[in-house]
C-alpha cells in the first residue's frame, strides 16, 4: 500500500539527530559503492512575465538498503531587491507556497512505497548536511557561528549545529533587521 506522508507527519517523527545519522550513513554507503545519486538538475523556462522564470528541478538516489527516491520541485524564480541587496526568490503558485514531492520506491520489486511532501524534510536534510560539515570540519572547540540569512534554512542549520557543537554565540547576517532580530531571539 502506497503511503501519503505530509509535512505535519514528518515534523511529528523526524528529529535532527535522526536526520544527521541517516545522512552520515548515506554518505558512507555512497563512498562504499552501495548507493547512487544524481545531483540536482534545474531547468528554467521564461514565463510570460519577463521578470520571472519557471524552474523544474529533480534529484534522485538510492541504496542497497532497499530504496530509491526522486525529488521533484516546481517553482517560479525571480530576483527581489531589499535595501540594495538582490536575492533570488522562489515560490509555487504564489509567494509563501512551495511544491516539492518525493516518490519513494522499492529497489526489490519497483513498488511505489510513498508520496512524501518535502517542505519540512528538505529543510532538515539541508540543515543536517551543514551539521555534518561542522561535526567533521570545524574546530572541536568552536563555539561561535556566523550565519547568512534568517529564514527557514538558517533555522535548520542552527538546529543541526547545536546537535554537533555547544554553541555560545550566534552572529546573524541578514538584510532585514526585524527578521534578523527575531531569528536571534528564537535561537537564544
Predicted feature locations:
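Active-site cradle of extracellular carbohydrate-active enzymes
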Residues: 147
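N-terminal ligand-binding/catalytic initiation module
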Residues: 1-125, 131, 141
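Short helix-loop-beta connector
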Residues: 137-144, 166
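Glycine-rich Rossmann-fold phosphate-binding loop(s) that bind the pyrophosphate
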Residues: 150-151
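Aromatic pocket-lining residues of Rossmann-like dinucleotide-binding sites
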Residues: 161
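NAD(P)-binding Rossmann-fold cofactor-contacting core
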Residues: 164-188
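N-terminal Rossmann-fold NAD(P) dinucleotide-binding loop
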Residues: 154-155
Amino acid at each position: 500500500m502506497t503511503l501519503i506522508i505530509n509535512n505535519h507527519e514528518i515534523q511529528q517523527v523526524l528529529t535532527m539527530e535522526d536526520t544527521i545519522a541517516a545522512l552520515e550513513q548515506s554518505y558512507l554507503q555512497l563512498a562504499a559503492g552501495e548507493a547512487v545519486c544524481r545531483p540536482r538538475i534545474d531547468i528554467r523556462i521564461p514565463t510570460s512575465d519577463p521578470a520571472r522564470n519557471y524552474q523544474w528541478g529533480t534529484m534522485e538516489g538510492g541504496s542497497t538498503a532497499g530504496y530509491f527516491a526522486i525529488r521533484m520541485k516546481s517553482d517560479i524564480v525571480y530576483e527581489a531587491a531589499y535595501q540594495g541587496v538582490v536575492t533570488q526568490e522562489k515560490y509555487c503558485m504564489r509567494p509563501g507556497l512551495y511544491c516539492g514531492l518525493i516518490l519513494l520506491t522499492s529497489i526489490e520489486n519497483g513498488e511505489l512505497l510513498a508520496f512524501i511532501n518535502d517542505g519540512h524534510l528538505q529543510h532538515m536534510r539541508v540543515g543536517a548536511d551543514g551539521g555534518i560539515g561542522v561535526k567533521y570540519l570545524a574546530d572541536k572547540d568552536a563555539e561561535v557561528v556566523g550565519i547568512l540569512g534568517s529564514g527557514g534554512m538558517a533555522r535548520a542549520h542552527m538546529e543541526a549545529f547545536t546537535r554537533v557543537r555547544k554553541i555560545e554565540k550566534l552572529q546573524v547576517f541578514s538584510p532585514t533587521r526585524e527578521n534578523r532580530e527575531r531569528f536571534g531571539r528564537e535561537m537564544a
